Amino acid sequence: MLDIKRLGIDDAAKLIEGARRHANDIGVPMCIAVVDESGNLIAFERMDGGKASSISVAQNKAYTAGAARKATHEYNAACVPGNLVFGIHTELSVVGGGLPVWAGDACVGGIGLSSGTPDQDMACAQAGIDYWAAHSQ
């Protein structure tokens, strides 16, 4: 029997809150997605002004980070033409803004943001994780 750690809805709310606060601080309304360790959506928020075209992008970033347990920007260099994993895109995202969420040595989910630049998306994702870590337990 497996003992699986995963994010719950309260955790997702904290991740979104932290990401939203940073997005407000930098003046960029975001789409924010949180998934469990298998990449299944737990919660999503489109801030007022978040781009409609960023809804699925944020969800794909979160999926990649949670299910693959790897930050989306780390896939970028590996997925260029000529490299062995070029073409794996489907739901996987290679654009910065998706980060795995770790509790100790367990990946418990992922957070993905979209609507800003990749650097802005990554900063907001990290702010969400930092807020969650500071307000959990």
Residue map of PLM features:
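Flexible, solvent-exposed loop/hinge segments and secondary-structure transition points
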Residues: 1-137
